[in-house]
């Protein structure tokens, strides 16, 4: 097999090999992100996350995904709640994955599909976590997102 026939899945695996997810920012920001990453590990999504996201960087502006850099720019408020932050990181990783796969969908549809993955993550974390506090927060976030979808 030549190097050009590896495909997106092979590129993702190659990108993941030996690569650590970088966290850049203040000590408090880094501590909060690492707390969220522990939850990503509990749910079994860490390898997936680091395959598609290479850096989580603290910024003063609006939290956003930089697809071209595979970087999440997050402000300090985005990482205050570790369960919500973990689910956001997984959602963004799915968004990057869909871009890598070349899905030709409307931007809103990509957001919606990656959002569905966020809910799947919360359900999986709720199943796998031993912490009642984490389970309650997963339940609260799922309920909140379900209610907000009903409005639209």
Positions of the model-derived regions?
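Auxiliary, metal-adjacent structural segments of Zn-dependent hydrolase domains
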Residues: 7-70
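Second-shell loop/turn segments in exported
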Residues: 21-28, 79, 101-105
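Charge-rich, solvent-exposed alpha-helical interaction surfaces
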Residues: 32, 36-39, 92, 121, ...
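Sec-exported extracytoplasmic/periplasmic mature domains
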Residues: 41-45, 98, 119-126
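Short pre-active-site segment immediately N-terminal to the catalytic Zn-binding motif
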Residues: 73-88
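Active-site recognition of the HExxH zinc-binding catalytic motif
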Residues: 87-100
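Post-HExxH zinc-binding segment in Zn-dependent metallohydrolases
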Residues: 106-141
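Amphipathic alpha-helical coiled-coil segments
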Residues: 145-152
């Amino acid at each position: 097999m030549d190097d050009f026939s590896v495909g997106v899945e092979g590129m993702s695996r190659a990108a993941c090999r030996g690569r650590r997810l970088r966290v850049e920012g203040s000590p408090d920001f880094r501590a909060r992100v690492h707390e969220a990453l522990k939850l990503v590990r509990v749910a079994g999504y860490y390898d997936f996350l680091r395959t598609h996201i290479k850096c989580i960087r603290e910024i003063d502006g609006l939290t956003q995904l930089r697809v071209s850099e595979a970087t999440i720019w997050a402000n300090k408020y985005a990482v205050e709640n570790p369960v919500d932050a973990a689910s956001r990181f997984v959602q963004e990783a799915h968004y990057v994955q869909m871009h890598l796969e070349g899905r030709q969908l409307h931007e809103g549809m990509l957001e919606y599909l990656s959002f569905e993955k966020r809910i799947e993550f919360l359900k999986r974390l709720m199943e796998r976590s031993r912490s009642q506090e984490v389970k309650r927060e997963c339940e609260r976030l799922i309920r909140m997102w379900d209610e907000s979808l009903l409005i639209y």
